[in-house]
């Protein structure tokens, strides 16, 4: 039997109709009627219980990365919703379609000193559009709520993908479950965008360019074969990082990027890790830049008055494979590639890296060819890195490696508060007892406030956390992490465990 609340039943029916199969659920009484419906629907949904809402949205991001379909989160009323906001912001900047469902208390109780009662409508703005899914007492309201839900779920694919927020007021009595069937709903078909064509002036510009450059920022969609072809044919110089996930194209990371002087740039993907390369391109006078993505945005990352083409980048890149000539300077640039320190070749399904030092260290340490690399580079915050890896591991078949710094780990330690995690999750915790990146910022060492108040020096260890969450704990000391990384990874990946494994490496800054 389902809830007696018509708005909850209509919401449940739309979740099924729009093929939302995975839902992260958090504890609470106000959202309990929604959770009951989700559970009652049986095999229609796979529920992922997460206690800490600060972790929940990041777990959903990890699930989306693995499954590439919208994921929902369901929380109770009050600050539970606000605790999800960092994860919703991360999803917004990476165009990840999450469905944020918040139970709410009646509007009449706001401002009356009732518990867990805050203004929730629009609380995720500007990171997620909000629809109010009000309680239904007559047919006209049902039509209106049905329309709102139809519109909301359709918006998941807008602007290249985006999170949405469904706020669901629920009045008492909450726990009456006597409805036999969910309502029938129909969904509207979306019209696919037409295939785009490269503008003629850009076709001519790239054909005549001496050293055309393709820059691939963070890329989480499937590998684009055209990029590999453009590189192999010496048609474009490809600059890509590990989180670009473009296989051998990312060898361009080992160029001396400060000496590059391209005369045309195509820019796709999200954030770049390499700040200095970005700053270098900003110094080149009148550099033509074409930004290609499926969103309505037009970031001018290199301060060059970039032009924008709204389409799937793979379509344009395949056109370039068919039309661009071989470039001698591109071939010469590739011949000057230095060898990476190490090629990452370990039996894992995916790698997740924390922000700040961790993502930069992995970029310098390894050329990662056959394993996808992920990082929360939407907002570039330290929160949620462990939870995202944990979320991915819930749906993974193989081992998932999380390389993370100490501050990020301790900040998000509740990502391990999950009874469904198993030995697939392996964590390489780099503990240099502070935020090490702050010690490498020019000029910051001049302030005596640096160690305690900026870099957050500490003496903490993850051993107690591992015990609390029933994880396998290993530790090691390393005076040179770059040299010791190989045998440390072998140690971390080879141990048998039915729960996540943490290898905490104590190393100097």
Annotate the PLM regions.
Residues 1-6, 280-357, 461-509:
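Phosphate/pyrophosphate-binding active-site segments
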Residues 3-74, 80-83, 89:
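N-terminal cofactor/phosphate-binding cores enriched in small/glycine residues
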Residues 8-12, 16-19, 26-30, 34-39, ...:
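Active-site diphosphate/adenylate-binding microenvironment
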Residues 21-24, 46-48, 66-105, 262-269, ...:
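A short, small-residue-rich loop immediately preceding and capping a beta-strand
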Residues 83, 216-290, 301, 368-398, ...:
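Glycine-rich, anion-gripping cofactor-binding loops and their flanking helix/strand elements
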Residues 91, 102-152, 239-334, 419-420, ...:
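Glycine-rich, acidic loop regions that bind phosphate or pyrophosphate groups
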Residues 101, 108-121, 366-509:
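Thiamine diphosphate
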Residues 146-151, 155-208:
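Conformationally flexible catalytic loops at phosphate/diphosphate-handling active centers
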């Amino acid at each position: 039997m389902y809830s007696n609340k018509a708005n909850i039943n209509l919401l449940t029916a739309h979740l099924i109709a729009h093929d939302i199969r995975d839902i992260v659920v958090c504890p609470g009484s106000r959202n309990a009627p929604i959770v009951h419906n989700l559970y009652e629907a049986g095999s229609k949904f796979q529920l992922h219980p997460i206690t800490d809402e600060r972790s929940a949205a990041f777990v959903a991001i990890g699930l989306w990365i693995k499954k590439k379909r919208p994921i929902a989160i369901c929380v109770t009323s009050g600050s539970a919703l606000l605790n999800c906001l960092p994860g919703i912001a991360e999803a917004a900047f990476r165009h990840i379609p999450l469905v944020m469902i918040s139970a709410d208390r009646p509007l009449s109780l706001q401002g009356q000193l009732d518990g867990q009662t805050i203004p929730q409508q629009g609380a995720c703005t500007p990171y997620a559009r909000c629809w109010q899914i009000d309680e239904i007492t007559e047919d006209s309201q049902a039509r209106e709520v049905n329309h709102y839900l139809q519109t909301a779920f359709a918006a998941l694919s807008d602007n290249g993908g985006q999170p949405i927020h469904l706020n669901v007021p629920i009045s008492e009595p909450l726990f009456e479950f006597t409805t036999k069937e969910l309502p029938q709903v129909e969904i509207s078909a979306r019209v696919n965008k037409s295939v785009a064509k490269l503008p003629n002036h850009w076709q001519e510009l790239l054909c005549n360019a001496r050293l055309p450059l393709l820059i691939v920022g963070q890329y989480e969609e499937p590998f684009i074969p055209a990029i590999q072809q453009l590189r192999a044919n010496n048609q474009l110089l490809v600059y890509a990082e590990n989180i670009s996930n473009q296989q051998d194209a990312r060898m361009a990371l080992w160029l001396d990027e400060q000496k590059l002087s391209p005369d045309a740039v195509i820019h796709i993907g999200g954030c770049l890790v390499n700040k200095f390369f970005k700053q270098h391109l900003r110094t080149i006078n009148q550099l033509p830049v074409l930004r290609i993505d499926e969103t309505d945005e037009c970031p001018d990352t290199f301060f060059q008055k970039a032009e924008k083409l709204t389409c799937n980048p793979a379509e344009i890149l395949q056109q370039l494979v068919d039309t661009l000539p071989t470039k001698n300077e591109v071939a010469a640039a590739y011949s000057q590639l230095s060898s990476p320190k190490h090629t990452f070749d370990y039996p894992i399904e995916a790698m997740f890296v924390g922000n700040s030092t961790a993502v930069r260290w992995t970029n310098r340490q390894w050329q990662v060819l056959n394993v996808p690399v992920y990082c929360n580079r939407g907002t570039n915050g330290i929160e949620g890195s462990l939870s995202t890896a944990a979320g991915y591991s819930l749906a993974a078949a193989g081992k998932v490696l999380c390389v993370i710094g100490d501050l990020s780990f301790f900040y998000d330690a509740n990502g391990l508060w999950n009874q469904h995690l198993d030995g697939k999750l392996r964590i390489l915790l780099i503990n240099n007892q502070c935020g090490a990146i702050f010690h490498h910022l020019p000029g910051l060492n001049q302030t005596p406030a640096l160690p305690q108040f900026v870099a957050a020096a500490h003496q903490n260890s993850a051993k107690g956390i591992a015990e609390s969450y029933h994880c396998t704990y290993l530790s090691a000391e390393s005076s040179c992490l770059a040299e010791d990384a190989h045998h440390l990874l072998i140690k971390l990946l080879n141990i048998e465990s039915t729960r996540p494994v943490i290898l905490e490496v104590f190393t100097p800054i």
